[in-house]
């Protein structure tokens, strides 16, 4: 029996990037929903359960950093794995994103294979470890 596809939410207002990222992740076996605004993303997060969030920082209705603060302050989304995808690529931008609670940070433009590798690593790190998996016990 096949495990259900892991669900990802992509919040980004760039329709071309959203289509490219969505296609690449779907081809890798993930279920991908997208939202073009923070308000749409917030509504999806309240209505659905996701395994990870991919978030642009510069959106028409707000700042992704403020959105991240709110996510990390909410018990329901506090531990949701978060990958920031943004044109803000300076070292201080990455540091601020990570300090606010992002689990990873990928500046645009990026290679689709790198995005896929980072999503896999993000989900692997977030996976619960069972006693059977703990070989050091």
Predicted regions and their residues:
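Short hydrophobic/Thr-rich beta-strand motif most characteristic of the beta2 strand and flanking loop
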Residues: 29-38, 44
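Charged docking surfaces used in two-component/phosphorelay signaling
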Residues: 19-27
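The feature encodes the CheY-like receiver
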Residues: 18, 60, 78, 90, ...
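Active-site residues of response regulator receiver
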Residues: 56, 86
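His-Asp phosphorelay/catalytic-motif detector in bacterial-type signaling
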Residues: 49-51, 75-81
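Short, Lys/Arg-enriched segments at the junction into DNA-binding effector domains
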Residues: 4-7, 121-137
């Amino acid at each position: 029996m096949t495990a259900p596809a892991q669900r990802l939410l992509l919040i980004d207002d760039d329709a071309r990037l959203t289509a490219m990222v969505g296609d690449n992740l779907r081809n890798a076996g993930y279920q991908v929903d997208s939202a073009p605004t923070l308000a749409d993303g917030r509504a999806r997060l309240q209505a659905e359960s996701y395994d990870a969030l991919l978030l642009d920082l510069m959106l028409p209705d707000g700042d992704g950093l403020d959105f991240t603060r709110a996510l990390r302050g909410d018990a329901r989304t506090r531990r949701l794995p978060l990958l920031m995808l943004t044109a803000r690529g300076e070292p201080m931008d990455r540091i601020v994103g990570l300090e606010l609670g992002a689990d990873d940070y990928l500046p645009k433009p990026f290679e689709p294979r790198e995005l896929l590798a980072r999503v896999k690593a993000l989900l692997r790190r977030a996976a619960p470890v069972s006693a059977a998996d703990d070989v050091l016990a």
